[in-house]
């Protein structure tokens, strides 16, 4: 049996994110395109002698006592009946509170790592049950590999249909460094005058639109307008990327990272070389 495992947790971008009307239970359904990108958190999961223990060490980032890693550990133990103790060391590279799914991806990575560590393969039903108790975006990150880099996502995030991922997407990301909780962001969307607007791309056409030239995309993000209204830093990021001649500019998730998509790697690299001097957190990335 292994005594430790290393796992990587990729970030994601929402290329499109429509927030639907609030449901009777107070939650919202979404319609979205999720895209994994090669920016990773790294986790070292080690066995410890004590049972029913999940110790989390995060040297570069302060985590609350209860977090997605501990939630994933508890969910794994509940599904499998295993109660072995572990220590998880998290090396954080995905910006926090950025809309890039870092916490959810970390949770999925813990489930995967624990499966390897204890030699137990979770069934699809067990994975679904565990993900539902950790977070809505966890479902997208449950599978890894080229076949699982892009998906059409709906419901609260639990309905994931993987699609062929494009390899010709060239991103520049700007991190404004502001944060609004997910609850606050949804409240802003609910109060925003465009909350009920019809999407430019019907849900059943999202995959087809994804395959078109980026300059022809009619995607949008329901969070972008209200969050940009609240935070001038987000407005600045959107403006800077638009002025850099990106073919498509959008915010991911409920913010606050903003990304631009460029027609070529050269165009993206040139924009990055200019923007990195005025933005402390600026990234040049491609689709995985």
Residue ranges of model-derived segments:
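Conserved, helical-rich catalytic subdomain that frames metal- and/or nucleotide-binding sites
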Residues: 54, 143, 147-248, 263-288
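Short, basic/glycine-rich phosphate-binding loops at helix/coil junctions
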Residues: 49-63, 110, 132, 211-220
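Contiguous, small/hydrophobic- and glycine-enriched helical/loop subdomains that border
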Residues: 111-156
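A generic local secondary-structure boundary/capping motif
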Residues: 32-34, 128, 158-164
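Hydrophobic C-terminal alpha-helix "anchor/cap" residues
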Residues: 34-37, 131, 241, 275
């Amino acid at each position: 049996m292994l005594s430790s495992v290393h796992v990587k947790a990729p970030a994601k971008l929402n290329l499109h994110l429509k927030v639907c009307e609030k449901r009777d239970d107070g939650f919202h359904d979404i319609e979205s395109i999720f895209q994994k990108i090669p920016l990773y958190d790294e986790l070292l999961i080690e066995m410890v002698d004590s049972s029913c223990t999940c110790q989390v060490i995060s040297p570069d980032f302060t985590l609350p006592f209860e977090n997605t890693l501990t939630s994933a550990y508890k969910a794994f133990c509940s599904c499998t009946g295993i109660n072995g103790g572990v220590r998880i060391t998290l090396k954080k590279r995905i910006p926090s509170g950025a809309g890039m799914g870092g916490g959810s991806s970390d949770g999925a990575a813990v489930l995967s790592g624990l499966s390897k560590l204890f030699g137990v393969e979770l069934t699809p039903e067990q994975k679904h049950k565990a993900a539902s108790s950790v977070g809505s975006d966890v479902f997208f990150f449950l599978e890894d590999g080229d076949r699982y880099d892009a998906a059409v996502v709906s419901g609260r995030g639990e309905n994931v249909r993987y699609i062929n991922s494009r390899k010709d997407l060239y991103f520049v990301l700007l991190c404004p460094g502001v944060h609004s909780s997910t609850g606050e962001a949804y409240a802003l969307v609910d109060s925003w005058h465009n909350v009920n607007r019809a999407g430019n791309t019907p849900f059943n056409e999202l995959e087809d639109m994804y395959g078109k030239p980026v300059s022809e995309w009619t995607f949008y993000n329901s969070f972008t307008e209200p969050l940009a209204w609240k935070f001038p830093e987000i407005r600045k990021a959107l403006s800077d990327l638009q002025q850099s001649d990106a073919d498509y500019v959008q915010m991911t998730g409920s913010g606050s990272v903003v990304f631009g998509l460029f027609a070529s790697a050269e165009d993206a690299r040139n924009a990055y070389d200019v923007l990195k001097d005025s933005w402390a957190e600026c990234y040049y990335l491609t689709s995985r």
